[in-house]
Amino acid sequence: MLAAAIELVVIATSCMVRDAHGHDYRAALAMSLLYFEGQRSGRLPPAQRVQWRADSALADGADHRVPDLASPPSSNVSVCARTDAMQCDMQVDLTGGYYDSGDNVKFGFPMAFTVAALSWSVVEYGDRLDAAGELGHALDAVRWGADYLTRAHASAGGGEALYVQVGDGDSDHSCWQRPENMDTPRTAYMVNASSPGSDIAAETAAALASAADANFSSTLLLHAKQLFEFAKNHRGLYHNSVPSAAKFYASSGDEDELLWAAAWLYIATGGEEEYSAYIAGATNVGGVRSMFSWDDKFVGAQALLVLQGKLPADGSHAEMKTNLEQFICNLVQHSGGNGGGGGGARLSPGGMLWWDSWNNMQYVTLASLVLAVHADHLTAARSASLQCGGGASRSPAQLTAFVRSQVDYILGSNPETMSYMVGYGSRYPAEVHHRAASLPSIKSSPAKVTCKGGFDYLNKGSPDPNVIAGAIVGGPDADDRYDDSRQNFRQAEPSTVTVAPIVGILARLLPS
């Protein structure tokens, strides 16, 4: 059944668009959006295409209550034990959203960043997505995440409170169960005025502002504005308020998220003074960064604001432009082979940008999106090239060619001759570190898989019974070697953060 489903996706892309290596970007684009349907939590919609998944986590938030919106939100507790209907009559709904990778926790920090990266793909390349027949699926993917984030804010009472996580990483990782009938704790965690999380509040503001720009939703924009104010007024890292998150998605600071959120709000509001003033007054615009990631958004903020071209050409804006250009130059200037560009990345012998042994592909796709949009910015601005140090320069065409090389590597033009996008091509990872994919579908095998019994499937050493099509695994090591083992979570686990930017990149590489 699954192979047939994948075949249908490929057939649906009626015009095959292949590059010099024979890669079909249209099919890869379709699969990348299919992946998000495989990551859905909550009650699945009638149009759900990934049929081996089923409804899951339908009681998320049900054990929580918050004060009625007519009353001031509590800033002290997240679980209401009172029975007074006037003070505690709103049951929390935290269903929906995405599982971030191969486990069953809903981590708000990477989920919000995923929504922002997906929205950026739509904002930049919506016309190309539409021409490929995938704009509707892309907007559905954005909306599924944005709707959850909106509920996480509204269910917390709105204003200065936000639910930021459902589930506990330690208890989840002690079990190997499919999401449809997991029995691990579904604890919900909140930040508020007394237990702040300015980083995650600002990131959620960025997600909703970017989604508002992609979906033209005034409701999303209102929540984004409220969350930005919350973030500015109550500074503090969210993992200090929610220690359960610290081991998995700890934050290194909040200034990048605040600048990133201000940039998206500036765009979504058409340049409202509040956000341009915040940007102009920012004392830390990041310098030259080593990467763009779920924890470090300075590069994204710099790119967004340079793309606008409407801010003053001096002060912090000029600094951001210089920093962004140096980041890009560091990536594309190499001494060949194993030579290192600056900025913390180097090229593997096979030509892959390489930062880290754990899910390196997330950095590859995010950096590639920045390069793609900047190349288009140079073209639109009629700039002949990007000037790098030592008199070197890179034309928009050269930047785009570099992006293409990274995408082609992911799709199979690499020393392993393996596609790191699951389901694409004739050879791709068979043992993905992903609970739902590795366990029998509840539809074909409804018998419960116990917490510890599931580890038999983790350790089985056989192909996944369900192909999580469109997922991009963590990828090979610095020498282009990949170990296709489900236990190899550093290389074999996919994430929504990795796939979100490639949606835009693949759309960009399609002919206009």
Curated annotation (Swiss-Prot):
Signal peptide: 1-22
GO BP of this protein: cell wall organization; cellulose catabolic process
Keyword Secreted assigned: yes
InterPro entries attached to this UniProt entry: 6-hairpin_glycosidase_sf, 6hp_glycosidase-like_sf, Glyco_hydro_9, Glyco_hydro_9_His_AS
Family: Belongs to the glycosyl hydrolase 9 (cellulase E) family.
Keyword Glycoprotein: yes
Catalytic residues of the enzyme: D103 (nucleophile), H433, D484, E493
One MF annotation (Gene Ontology) recorded for this entry: cellulase activity
Protein name: Endoglucanase 14
GO CC entries: extracellular region
Database matches in PROSITE patterns: GH9_1, GH9_2
SUPFAM superfamilies linked to this entry: Six-hairpin glycosidases (SSF48208)
EC number(s) given by UniProt: 3.2.1.4
Predominant location: secreted
PANTHER family the UniProt entry points to: ENDO-1,4-BETA-GLUCANASE (PTHR22298)
Pfam families given in the database record: Glyco_hydro_9
Annotated glycosylation sites: N76, N192, N215
Alphabetically ordered keywords of this record: Carbohydrate metabolism, Cell wall biogenesis/degradation, Cellulose degradation, Glycoprotein, Glycosidase, Hydrolase, Polysaccharide degradation, Secreted, Signal
Origin: domain of life: Eukaryota
Reaction(s) catalysed by this chain's protein: Endohydrolysis of (1->4)-beta-D-glucosidic linkages in cellulose, lichenin and cereal beta-D-glucans
Entry's localization field: Secreted
